[in-house]
Amino acid sequence: MDTNNKYLKKETVSNYSSRNANHYDDPMNKNFVYGEMTVNFVNQLNFEDKDNVVADIGCGTGFAYDILYEKIKDDKRKFIGVEPAKGMLDLAVEKFKSNENFSFQEGTFAKIPLEDNSVDKIISTLALHWVPSLDDSIKELKRVLKPNGSIDIMMTAKDDGEGFKKPIIVAMQKHLNFKQIMKASALSQRVSPTHIQNYFSKEFDLENDYTLNVDNIKKIIYGNFEEHMKWWKARSEQIISEVENKDQFMNDLKESLKTIETDQGIPFDLSILHIKLKRKK
């Protein structure tokens, strides 16, 4: 991807994430589709005694720290959030302003505003797939991570929502040209567990120094149109940023999604990657 395309992708994702910041804290989004998966992922995180500095990269509104708060609020650890979208960053700062152990800074995966070898544990939920370059991002993770540090990341997999996206593309074809659709589809990284292994192996010695586990979790989530649109608008509106008549698009999308609806509702074929990197003992 060339420099101009990287910049456009970064700006598109950041701008629309910022604009939709309030939707991310909607109770529906915390308990439906990606929300449920995120809660499960975060609750399984394990903090060791050595993990004095924890950084959530692409922290959004601080959702992961929300989930963990009762367990970590009195910890002596330092919890840092890094987020490119100002709207989300502002919400995170406001929510955690009463606890001095939490701090938030503007930044991206490719430009983390932290010193070399300064973080014991890096976490991230549903953010890494939005980066312009996985190579640049993983190189930066390696830079800020302490040599004995660990990484826990949750991101969408290559086939996430594959069936759900087909009627979306049908609706998009009524409003966007081929070039615009291809541009929208390129906003998100589409990677498999094998891809992740290859990317991380460029920066981390997986043969001698680190272990990397990549699990692919799949689940079908059923809901009605309104339920799906709650989370889809919050997480995917940047994909239709160039649609001029968004009301008509939503009407067309509603009709298009009826083609995959079942007695249980409209299915979303969720496919998530859980990435865990640890130093070998």
Where are the language model's segments positioned?
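Conserved class I S-adenosyl-L-methionine
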Residues: 1-51, 63-71, 88-91, 95
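C-terminal helical/coil "lid" or tail adjacent to the Rossmann-like core of SAM-dependent
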Residues: 13, 19-23, 210-264
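Class I SAM-dependent methyltransferase SAM/SAH-binding core
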Residues: 53-111
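A short acidic, Gly/Pro-enriched loop at the edge of an enzyme's catalytic core
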Residues: 110-121
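Conserved catalytic/acceptor-binding region of the Class I
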Residues: 135, 150-220, 239
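Short glycine-centered segments of the SAM/dcSAM-binding site in methyltransferase folds
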Residues: 53, 149-150
